[in-house]
Regions:
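Gram-negative bacterial Sec-dependent N-terminal signal peptides
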Residues: 1-32
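Predominantly soluble domains enriched in secretory-pathway, periplasmic, or organellar proteins
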Residues: 34-468
Length: 468
């Protein structure tokens, strides 16, 4: 019988204890690994929207209101940027409806741009990314070189156009969501900006359907008419310039989410953009009647061109359109109604407005998502100048007389004046939510803006801008 020495038995006891400790440690690590891989959310639909607590744009150093929706009740939400938690003290917790509200302060040194904010959730786990845009601050300048005259009109101003023949201005307005019951087409005297005539559109078909609210506007001096888009009814209407009498109300559904309407008087054709689709609908402006549908094919694989803003240059009979979703521009021959080219817009995120300079064949494209104006060679598609104009660069008008582009920056509340080489000549304060601008062919600019609320003294105005 062999008996192990005492030292050997002691060694076995040490080995057993060590083995047990190792197994316990491994078990703990395994448990920890399992806990970090908790059951994922099989039906994750959480989304977060950010808006400024004060002002009209998110800026460096400003406070942001977060509105979270679609989360699982009780779900814990942590936000981070570059691996740094933005709510390190405590996770946000979704309420019984799966929502949460919170505020967050943007660092003073935050760079302008769209920042990828990572959403990490627990109980159950999930992850997503949402873009948080921090807009640049472009200082006001050049006010001493311009004379601005502003007049308050009616609630909900959208677009403005002018008659080269009479000088009269035509302005559209609409208030609220469907069914829209407050909407007007205005005719203004350009001398004092007083309302000469105003019309509430006819009732739209259907029970409690509101009116044929007017949004986009385009003047046709050859036929003495003014075209409007009825966005909520997906169609267009034509009125007389003289007394705003209705010439024709086209049937609902003809132009899905009709946004912009422009007229080539020499060709006697009108064109309306079907927003967020690849389609533009052309009309015989004299009859008036539908001509055809023009479809723009995107160059981005698997994506669809989503036209919103559109411009017609009658000197070259070309249509220019931009795609909100694919960041592309299209050139269309208004005579043949054929798409000539489609190209990517370098430096643009969610482009909205477009204008053209026939002398240089340059496009001026505003991009709301990147807060800039892109000056693009229409022949090559190359971006020649990338100009930061301010929060929410929305629309642009080019004046061939003064050879300047005028950009309405919705979030910044400004009108930026830029030359064809990308130099900012002025940045003028324009009031709340500048929406649209037009040039009259004589070097005068008219811009309209919307109000932030009923008591906003700087909203719902038309402003005449003239160089001194």
């Amino acid at each position: 019988m062999n008996i192990a020495p005492a030292s050997s038995a002691k060694g076995r006891r040490v080995f057993s204890v060590t083995l047990l400790a190792t197994l316990l440690a491994l078990g703990g690590q395994a448990a920890q690994a399992r806990s970090s891989f908790e059951a994922p959310d099989p039906d994750y639909h959480g989304e977060i929207k950010a808006s400024p607590v004060t002002g009209t744009a998110i800026l460096a150093g400003s406070e942001v209101a977060l509105d979270g929706r679609g989360f699982t009740p009780g779900q814990r939400i942590t936000l981070s940027r570059g691996g740094v938690a933005l709510n390190p003290d405590a996770a946000y917790v979704a309420d019984a409806q799966g929502n949460f509200k919170a505020t967050l302060r943007i660092p003073e040194d935050a760079a302008p741009g769209q920042h990828p904010i990572v959403i990490s959730t627990a109980q159950p786990s999930g992850a997503a990314v949402f873009p948080l845009k921090v807009s640049p601050v472009v200082p006001l300048s050049g006010a001493d070189a311009y004379s601005l005259t502003a007049v308050k009109l009616v609630p909900g101003l959208y677009q403005v156009d002018s008659s080269a023949k009479t000088g009269a201005l035509f302005v559209t307005s609409a208030v609220g969501r469907p069914p829209v019951k407050v909407s007007q087409l205005l005719k203004l005297d350009p001398k004092d900006l007083a309302i000469e005539r105003q019309l509430t559109p006819a009732a739209a078909p259907g029970a409690d359907a509101g009116v044929y609210a007017v949004y986009g506007v385009g003047v046709d001096d050859r036929n003495g008419t003014v075209w409007t888009t009825n966005t909520r009814q997906n169609t267009v209407a034509v009125y007389r310039q003289s007394d705003l009498g209705l010439v024709k109300q086209f049937e609902p559904g003809l132009v899905p989410h009709a946004h912009t309407v422009v007229v080539d008087e020499k060709l006697e054709r009108a064109f309306a953009s079907a927003a967020m689709t690849p389609d533009i609908v052309s009309f015989d402006a004299k009859t008036p009647a539908v001509r055809k549908h023009i479809t723009i094919e995107s160059g981005v694989r698997g994506e669809q061109f989503a036209v919103v803003g559109m411009h017609l240059d009658p000197t070259v009979h070309k249509l220019y359109a931009v795609s909100l979703k694919t960041n592309e521009a299209a050139v269309i021959d208004a005579k043949t109604e054929q798409v000539e080219k489609v190209f990517p817009i370098q430096g643009a995120k969610t482009p909205m407005g477009v204008a053209h300079d026939p002398q240089t064949d340059r496009l001026f494209i505003t991009a709301q998502g990147s807060d800039n104006l892109l000056i693009v060679d229409a022949k090559t598609g190359q971006t020649l100048h990338n100009v930061t104009t301010g929060a929410g660069a929305l629309n642009v008008a080019f004046d061939p007389v003064k050879r300047l582009a005028y950009v309405t920056n919705r979030g910044a509340g400004t009108l930026t004046v830029v030359d064809p080489d990308g130099t900012i000549k002025a940045n003028l304060e324009l009031g709340t939510y500048p929406n649209h601008a037009v040039v009259d062919g004589k070097g005068v600019v008219y811009a309209v803006n919307k109000a932030k609320g009923q008591d906003d003294a700087e909203g719902d105005r038309i402003t005449r801008v003239m160089a001194k």
